[in-house]
Regions:
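Gly/Thr-rich phosphate-binding beta-strand-loop-beta motif of the actin/hexokinase/Hsp70
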Residues: 2-28, 101-121, 168
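Short glycine-rich, Thr/Ser-proximal phosphate-binding strand/loop in the N-terminal lobe
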Residues: 6-46, 127-135
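Short beta-strand-loop/turn "lid" adjacent to the catalytic site in phosphate-handling enzymes
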Residues: 36-39, 54-88, 115-116
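Glycine-rich phosphate-binding loops at beta-strand->alpha-helix junctions
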Residues: 71, 217-243, 254-258
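Conserved phosphate-binding/catalytic loops in two-lobed NTP-binding clefts
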Residues: 83-87, 240-263
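Glycine-rich phosphate-binding loop plus the immediately following alpha-helix
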Residues: 119, 127-168, 267-271
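Glycine-rich phosphate-binding/hydrolytic loop that grips phosphoryl groups
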Residues: 142-147, 253-295
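Adenine-nucleotide phosphate-binding core of ATP-dependent small-molecule kinases
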Residues: 180-215
Length: 297
């Protein structure tokens, strides 16, 4: 690994619904601590909480911190940390952990991405050659699962247990939660099993991601599956594999895939910013995060 100017590398992925932290040993690149938590629209409080917990676990250690994610940049500025684009953080993690990957499918709280990788012809390094992202509607994302779970009156955490028992697949729109509701409500009225609706929702997500995002580009294996919705819903991964026609050996679900991008951000502290001094300090960052919302107004 790169020479480190701090004791630990820390990556924070601030998304639309969750905050993820990854603490990495600079000498090995191994994950020492991680956490994935919903922020319930209180991003600053959750970022502060996760950083304080990490400092409590590693007292006296200096942190080099890099933020990524849709909400990461203002926190990087407030805490005098580094900022890295999410797709770059993803590529760093893929390069370090699973360089055989050709395509990564990542589902977040309110976005979905398909990232295509290839070898740089000059350096031979794995790079992200193309990325497709929905970014407009929550269809085909974790929020879509939340919406369907609410319609079924089941907890999001229990959704997988319903889907894995589903037997029959019905046509449900994965493009939008509003359209999905018009498909699902009549099914409920007709007595269709919740298990079948949950499974059908996973098929809708996979169909939307493969057809809507890839837009004709071939998804070649090995394919990596990342993000909370794919980590906590193994049936969703199975559905993707079925629709892509790939085997278990051609599918990669990385260790701790729910914080995989945060892991990449942590690696960036050394691999991309190693020659720069990180200005992050525990006390100064705590004060900045405590008053984050006031300063942003």
């Amino acid at each position: 690994m790169s020479v480190s100017k701090t004791d630990l590398w820390v990556g924070m992925d601030v998304g639309s619904t969750t905050v993820k932290i990854a603490v990495v040993d600079p000498s090995t690149g191994k994950l020492l601590h991680y956490s994935y938590q919903r922020h319930n629209a209180m991003q600053a409080q959750k970022v502060l909480q996760l950083l304080q917990e990490a400092h409590g676990l590693f007292p006296g250690k200096t942190f080099g911190v890099a933020f990524c994610g849709s909400g990461g940049q203002p926190f990087a500025e407030a805490t005098k940390s580094f900022f890295i684009q999410e797709v770059v953080a993803n590529a760093l993690a893929v390069r370090a952990k699973h360089p055989e990957t050709r395509v990564a499918i990542e589902l977040g709280g309110q976005d979905a991405k398909v990232i295509f990788f290839e070898r740089d012809k000059t350096t031979g390094q794995l790079i992200a050659s193309d990325m497709r992202m929905n970014g407009v509607c929550a269809g085909g994302t974790g929020a879509f699962i939340d919406q369907v779970a609410e319609l079924l009156r089941v907890k999001t955490e229990a959704f997988e247990s319903f889907a894995c028992r589903g037997k029959k697949v019905y046509e449900i729109s994965g493009r939008c939660g509003v359209f999905a509701k018009t498909d699902i409500q009549p099914m409920l009225n007709q007595g269709v099993a919740k298990e079948d609706i949950a499974l059908s929702s996973f098929h809708a997500i996979a169909k939307q991601t493969i057809g809507g995002l890839a837009q004709g580009m071939e998804i070649k294996p090995p394919v990596m599956f990342e993000g909370g919705p794919l980590t906590f819903n193994p049936t969703l991964v199975r559905v993707f594999k079925e629709r892509l026609g790939i085997t278990d050996e051609q599918a990669i679900v990385p260790e701790h895939s729910e914080v995989f991008v945060a892991w990449g951000a942590a690696l960036a502290v050394g691999t991309m910013f190693g020659d720069k001094d990180c200005q992050y300090r525990e006390e100064g960052s705590r004060e900045a995060l405590l008053h984050f919302n006031e300063l942003r107004q």
